[in-house]
Amino acid sequence: MKNRWRLGKAITHTLLATTFVYQGGMSVAGAAQVTEITGNASGGAISGNNITYSNTSLFGYKHDDSTAATDGAVTLTNADIFISSGTTGLKGVYGGYSAGGAATGNSVFVTGYKHSSAPFGNSVICGGYAGSGAADGNKITFTNSKSSGVLYGGWAEAGDAKNSVVTITGSTITSNVVGGHTNAGTADNNEVKITDSEISYVVVGGEIFTDGSNASGAATNNKVTLINSSANIVYGGRVGGTWGIATGDTSANGIGDATGNTLTIESLKSGSTINLEQIFGGVVTGQGNANSNKVVLGKTGAGAVTMDKVNTLYGGGSQNGGGVRGGDANGNEIAIRSNVTLRTGTGSSNGTRIYGGYAYAGAANDNEVTISGGHVADMVIGGSSSTGAFGSGTANGNKVRVTGGSSIGGAVYGGFIGMGSASINNIIIEGGTIGGDIYGGYSGYGDAINNSITISGTVDLSNRTIYGGGSVSGNVKTGNTVSFKNTGGSVKAIKNIDVLGVSALANNGNAL
């Protein structure tokens, strides 16, 4: 079985049971075989100091049969490997490798590097590889080093990938970083922790997908934490291929749920800028639900930070892929703290769209976005369902809360849906600046009813219209309420409501 990613700069890697190829490298018939050094005869331990291993792969334990690889370890200090692209064989560093068994408790420790131009070129760094069975409890610790090869805490060909940890500090990775990967199983409770580092491509806590088929499994309870660090795309957990980016195989999708994954991004350095493009708590590309995932940006009490180039942020999302229908995105959360500014950094094109939950062909219910003094360059949507030709869905029970000191560059929607119900959504604006109109719920072709909008504190809506509900064709009034509490100022217009409540105006001389 194999797995291929193709990203914006055409980086491609292929993983076979016997061959790793990265960044343009390829196997050549009759080419030289890499040399393998194993710790099988020394208790599963290998260490290297102040050396570059040329066309050589390192294994704590390596078993070419069904023997499990357990508690193997490779330790490199100011050392690395460099493998020519034309060589064949397993290319990289493995704490433990089992061709037909499980891999448990294996480790790779890397501190510093030796080969300055491209350490770990045409290689993979893998805590534990399981050809059959679970990859469980493996880890990579990568400190003050560089790698042009991908990092996997654990890889399972046909089993669960769980409880693996990748820790990166003060390093540069010009490839991808994955806590746990499986081609057919559950990626559960894996973790990636990155501090003071730069990752050029993708970071994933836990994932399941494979080329050529719709892999069946799940990504649950995985975690990613970035501190003072940059990446291109970040997923807490994912089922299926790369969201919105060609994989090179239209069926590189998944069938299963992405549930309970968490992504935290923060900076402890005041005035710093973190480059990120796409942020996902948990997503499904294929068929399945993305529920109860969470994204937290910023840290209370930390210095101000700009998260630059961000164009997409989902708490949880499910979209179609490979001819199979997506699923629901329910109960996801996004929290943006007061020290965070999100922008795309492209001049007049600035804008970041935020979705608490997004479902291409399913329900987007009970999602929540909270902006506590943060700054967002474009629109905010609590829950969104496209539905379209796939029939009706729901975008119900979603919540958006904006507190004082926040600024939103675009419109605010509690719930948004192409076809179906956008009802029982709740928007609370407690001060701040809103750059567009406010909709409790919006349905292209359906009802937007029983939504509530509450405005309090100091907020200028003189050029904004508040809609209890909006729709091209549907009921947009019944049960919709707008309330003003302890506030003052003006509103351009209020439309499509049943009940208007005004109490305790903060400034009666500037009453609504």
Located regions from the model:
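Surface-exposed loop/turn motifs in large extracellular/passenger domains
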Residues: 33-92, 97-124, 129-150, 156-176, ...
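Sec-dependent signal peptide cleavage junction
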Residues: 24-34
